[in-house]
From Swiss-Prot:
PANTHER family given in the database record: MALONATE-SEMIALDEHYDE DEHYDROGENASE (PTHR43866), METHYLMALONATE-SEMIALDEHYDE DEHYDROGENASE [ACYLATING], MITOCHONDRIAL (PTHR43866:SF3)
Name of the protein in question: Probable methylmalonate-semialdehyde/malonate-semialdehyde dehydrogenase [acylating], mitochondrial
GO biological process: thymine catabolic process; thymine metabolic process; valine catabolic process; valine metabolic process
Gene responsible for this protein: alh-8
Catalysed transformations (reactions): 2-methyl-3-oxopropanoate + NAD(+) + CoA + H2O = propanoyl-CoA + hydrogencarbonate + NADH + H(+); 3-oxopropanoate + NAD(+) + CoA + H2O = hydrogencarbonate + acetyl-CoA + NADH + H(+)
Pfam families attached to this UniProt entry: Aldedh
Organism: Caenorhabditis elegans
Transit sequence range: 1-22
EC number(s) recorded for this UniProt protein: 1.2.1.27
Length: 523
């Protein structure tokens, strides 16, 4: 695989994993996936797909036409009529096969992610693996879908409630986890009897394309999962289409709020995971070496392009003296193309992302922050045109600074200081986001106080990125989430299903002689 990846530089012209055809510009065009088939879009409006390490155009992504998007929904709607009545055991078997196929094609999926998104190959495999765990959880759907029964609620009367699928659902995915986020969505939706239309990010759609092909190979019927491509018009189509009953979204604040408001206004169920500013509180009694290693990895891994990246370190008390050692660890990280051996940090997804990160670093300098490590001007030999920013540490940051108020989404660690734990908790709770946080300490009482008082949805105790395994739910809160049912776990099953309750009365000798006009009193 590494030899194949070596051949992508600098032009990245072989993307055999795509269903593609050659456009006039000689770049392959990414196809739609409708009714179990790769479909060439008839649009004349395309978006360039570039390799972030080189900025070479490797494919053209269509902005699908309204007719093509409607065809995807119609396909999902037709498939739902049969799929909803398919035995949960049959759907379970599809999930068993899908997880085996994903394992088989792990390296192929990771290669696609590295070429399109930029993250390192080991990190790309981690992207796939964490999504795979959701597929494995979906394999237990017969148990997860079990309902509730109470016999003899009244004389000769029984009541039972059970979960039924919603219908056609939609998933709108971000660029930063091209495999994991689609796998948060469509396996749970399909396992519970729904069908789905997926809109992957136009910046890296290849992994999603591969995954739906694997779903077909696993026995998922045609039409149960479809892919459309596009930008704003595709998002609004999903929000407005009356046949789509629920929307799952992961991405930025502006899009997340728009999708939640527009989708909810149209009567849809919406779960919207948005921005974050995740704090790591460093206590002086923590294991210094382990803590600094964990903090470095959580801040700079995936070039900081994770919604659960630990972007803000709060050094408490004597731990403030640890900053020079943290800087030294970050200095030793290797920045290079994601397919290069021993790379720690790959490129940012786009030129626009790099420009935003550089703007926020510059704002920190102007607003009085210290910059003990500045990766703004890094040059990667052989990849001078890539979207690279080196590891950067901004120290002495105050809550009113732009670099703290805005989500940076790059390899930049903001460092703040606190006199004590109470002050650190106050900093976190005053921030509008509530996705994740962590504390590093060897004191159980400190950890317990932090857990009880911090207002954040996901907390790590000596765990830098506390993303729960899928038997639990991803529980970001406050400004990081809109909706009332989170992703995967029990909440995920609830999101993609609704209750139906049946009350039945059977009596061999009915004795009612006249209508009972008062409201029934069950005894």
């Amino acid at each position: 695989m590494l030899s194949r990846l070596a051949r992508v530089q600098p032009k990245c012209q072989q993307l055999a994993h795509f269903s593609t055809s050659k456009s006039a510009a000689a770049a392959p065009t990414v196809k739609l996936w409708i009714d179990g088939q790769a479909v060439e879009s008839k649009t004349t409006d395309f978006v360039e797909l570039t390799n972030p390490a080189t900025n070479e155009v490797i494919a053209m992504v269509p902005n699908a036409t309204q007719a093509e998007m409607q065809a995807a929904v119609d396909s999902a709607k037709n498939a739902f009529n049969t799929w909803k009545n398919t035995s949960p055991l049959t759907r379970q078997q599809c999930m068993f096969k899908l997880q085996a196929l994903i394992k088989r094609d792990m390296k192929k999926l990771a290669e696609s992610i590295t070429i399109e998104q930029g993250k390192t190959l080991p990190d790309a495999e981690g992207d796939v693996s964490r999504g795979l765990q959701v597929v494995e959880h979906a394999c237990s759907v017969p148990s997860l879908m079990m309902g509730e029964t109470l016999p003899n609620v009244s004389r000769d009367m029984d009541t039972h409630s059970y979960r039924i699928p919603l219908g056609v659902t939609a998933g709108i995915c971000p660029f930063n986890f091209p495999a994991m986020i689609p796998l948060w969505m469509f396996p749970v939706a399909l396992a519970t009897g729904n069908t789905m239309v997926i809109k992957p990010s136009e910046q890296d759609p290849g992994a999603a394309q591969l995954l739906v092909e694997l779903a077909k190979e696993a026995g998922v019927p045609d039409g149960c999962v479809n892919i459309i491509h596009g930008q704003h018009s595709a998002v609004n189509f999903i929000c407005d289409n009356p046949d789509i009953k629920a929307i799952s979204f992961v991405g930025g604040d502006a899009a997340g709020k728009h999708i939640y408001e527009r989708g909810a206004k149209n009567g849809k169920r919406v779960q919207s995971n948005m921005g974050a500013k995740n704090h790591g509180v460093i206590m002086a009694d923590a294991n210094k070496e382990q803590t600094l290693n964990q903090l470095t990895a959580a801040a700079f891994g995936a070039a900081g392009q994770r919604c659960m990246a630990l972007t803000t370190a709060v050094l408490v008390g004597e731990a403030r003296a640890w900053l020079p050692e943290l800087v030294e660890k970050a200095k030793n990280l290797k920045v290079n193309a994601g397919w290069k051996p021993d790379t720690d940090i790959g490129p940012l997804i786009s030129k626009q992302s790099k420009a935003r990160v550089l703007r926020l670093i510059e704002s920190a300098k102007k607003e009085g922050a210290q910059v003990p490590l500045d990766g703004s001007n890094i040059t990667v030999p052989g990849f001078e045109n890539g979207n690279f920013v080196g590891p950067t540490i901004l120290a002495g940051v105050k809550p009113n600074m732009t670099c703290y108020r805005e989500e940076i989404f790059g390899p930049v660690l903001v460092v703040m200081e606190a006199e004590n734990l109470n002050e650190a908790i106050e900093i976190i709770n005053n921030n509008p986001y509530g996705n994740g946080t962590a504390i590093f300490t060897s004191n159980g009482a400190t950890a317990r106080k932090f857990t009880n008082e911090v207002d954040v949805g996901q907390i790590g105790i000596n765990v830098p990125i506390p993303v729960p395994l899928p038997m639990f739910s991803f529980t970001g809160s406050r400004g990081s989430f809109l909706g009332d049912l989170n992703f995967y776990g029990k909440a995920g099953i609830q999101f993609y299903t609704q209750w139906k309750t049946v009350t039945q009365y059977w009596n061999e000798s009915l004795t009612e002689l006249k209508p009972q006009m008062s409201f029934p009193q069950l005894k």
